[in-house]
Amino acid sequence: ITKISISVMNQMVLENSKISIKEAQKIVAVNYDIKGSVEKLDGEIDFNFKIQSTKGKNYLLKISRPNFESDYIDFQIKLLDHLNKNCEIEIAENKLTIDGNKSCIIKDNQGRDRSVRLLSWTEGRLWSSVNPINQSLRKGLGSNTAILTRSLINFKHSFSKREIEWDISNSLWVEHHIDKF
């Protein structure tokens, strides 16, 4: 398991279950010594923020929900490390805390642990915002998907064996909920 530091952020109490922009600014300043503007981003599980540092660099700040699985965080960290060593396309990189770790733990206002990670920012457009989606774009997506797949052939982690609801090969669960779609 990746080293996780218990930093000075343990003394900061988060105001609620969600993370405000002000709290995200404080978290990134205390744990990564980075100051700048913060923009809230959508996310499935983690609270995500784009950090635009005063030094001109952009980052992705990821703050877990309470009661996160440490194996899940370790999986994500090791996955990015593996891809950065084995993939020819640009992949976000794990950034180190001021303590030299790839993640740290903070406490929320109810005393629950949350994992914090900072990644390099990768510029690009969301697929949903691209218009028109043409043959060239589809070919590029397919090529990059193949590159990622090849790069992951030798990646092993116990957490990669779990079932994911949105995995198309595990989609039969929706059959009993089709009226909700």
Residue ranges and their predicted role:
Residues 63-110, 130, 135-139:
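A conserved alpha-helical element in kinase catalytic cores
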Residues 60:
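Glycine-rich ATP phosphate-binding loop
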Residues 33-49:
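ATP-binding glycine-rich phosphate-binding loop
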Residues 51-54:
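Active-site beta-strand termini and strand-to-loop segments that position acidic
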Residues 100, 118-130, 176-180:
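A glycine-centered beta->alpha junction motif in the catalytic cores
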Residues 8-34:
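Juxta-kinase regulatory segment immediately upstream of eukaryotic protein kinase catalytic domains
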Residues 131-181:
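A cross-family kinase active-site recognition segment
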